Amino acid sequence: MGQKVNPIGLRLGINRNWESRWFPTKANLVENIGEDYKIRAFLKRKLYYAGISQILVERTAKKLRVTVVAARPGIIIGKKGSDVDNLRKELQDLISKDVNINIKEERKAGASAQLAAESVATQLEKRIAFRRAMKKVIQGAQKAGAKGIKVSVSGRLGGAEMARTEWYLEGRVPLHTLRAKIDYGFAEARTTYGNIGVKVWIFKGEVLHKGMQPEKTEESAPAKKSRRTRRGK
């Protein structure tokens, strides 16, 4: 189960919170879901180069607040906040409602799975070797303090005739452990040979309740490193 399902959705209510935080009625449920989709699609397209790791949408009875967590917030804010004001106006025109925007900095960009996946996808589009791109992201996550990372790329890698999947694993990524705090990201690289899917899982440690003790592991054991290739049919 843990190998197939989205690890963020599996852990909602355990050690992850929802990214859309509001309580709907039957009358506005469909409208709110549609607005959330439009907001996220617009911001990801408009602010792609700002390195967005998370978009939170919060609603009250009269207010709608959007929080954007980005690795390069200066690109969004602009000089004296002028770009944020323009962005707010565009969002208000998009959904015909008043919107408050908060910009937060992603302090550990290397430990963000979404940013890591987008980084690999960008490098693949620039025709950088996929193994080199994967190793670079793994090194960045380790420097940021990640306890484990798995990177998977799928498609016509290197322009090969047959599609295949390759992945690297460093450290531990316990997908079946619900108390494990695992971040997940997905991106697509649009190359001349077709689309290449990129998936990244990052293990940041275990979230323990009071009275619980972490599992004992051998500190002297070297980090696990493996690579597996699966050819497409």
Swiss-Prot record:
By what name is this protein known? Small ribosomal subunit protein uS3
What does the UniProt record say this protein does? Binds the lower part of the 30S subunit head. Binds mRNA in the 70S ribosome, positioning it for translation.
Q: Which Gene3D superfamilies match?
A: 3.30.300.20, Ribosomal protein S3, C-terminal domain
Renumbered to this chain, the Basic and acidic residues biased-composition regions fall at 212-222
Residue ranges that the Swiss-Prot or TrEMBL entry lists as coiled coil: none
Q: Which organism is it from?
A: Campylobacter jejuni subsp. doylei (strain ATCC BAA-1458 / RM4099 / 269.97)
Q: State whether keyword Transmembrane helix applies.
A: no
What NCBIfam families does UniProt report for this protein, alphabetically? rpsC_bact (TIGR01009)
